[in-house]
Amino acid sequence: MPRRRLIGQRKILPDPKLGSERLAKFINILMKNGKKSLAETIVYSALEIIAKRSGKNYLEAFEAALDNVRPAIEVKSRRVGGSTYQVPVEVRSIRRDTLAMRWIVEAARKRSDKSMAIRLANELVDATEHKGAAVKKREEVHRMADANKAFAHYRW
């Protein structure tokens, strides 16, 4: 925590093609070594693949995938009297989006398809259908929170 004042969160400029701030955040998460134009190319081509396959709008498909991966609750470690408890905590809305995007990108990178655009498109399609590694990660986090429900009174 800063001593003087809280620093506000940086504003992310919307992406140039579709004007969506969430998509710009997704591109930034996908980006490696500052190569933003490459990340944009990958994301836009993945969205085109999804649009051809499903016939949906770009952003509708993207939002549907994010909705199915967003976690509602997670566990945080809390030390109480010499032992550490996994305390279930509700996830803030900004962190929900960030975690969902991060999990989708990680799952897409672990896939074994030809190009990153195809891997990302397949992971997004799987997420819209409640399948895939990103959705599995969300279910795992929810299961952990459910298993540690007894420690919810240690919330801070």
UniProtKB/Swiss-Prot annotation:
Family recorded in the similarity comment: Belongs to the universal ribosomal protein uS7 family.
NCBIfam families xref list: rpsG_bact (TIGR01029)
Protein name as annotated: Small ribosomal subunit protein uS7
GO annotation, cellular component aspect: small ribosomal subunit
Complex formation: Part of the 30S ribosomal subunit. Contacts proteins S9 and S11.
GO molecular function: rRNA binding; structural constituent of ribosome; tRNA binding
UniProt function note: One of the primary rRNA binding proteins, it binds directly to 16S rRNA where it nucleates assembly of the head domain of the 30S subunit. Is located at the subunit interface close to the decoding center, probably blocks exit of the E-site tRNA.
CDD domains registered for this protein in UniProt: uS7_Bacteria (cd14869)
InterPro entries named in the record: Ribosomal_uS7, Ribosomal_uS7_bac/org-type, Ribosomal_uS7_dom, Ribosomal_uS7_dom_sf
Superkingdom classification of source: Bacteria
A Pfam family per the record: Ribosomal_S7
GO biological process: one example: translation
Keywords (A to Z) from UniProt: Ribonucleoprotein, Ribosomal protein, RNA-binding, rRNA-binding, tRNA-binding
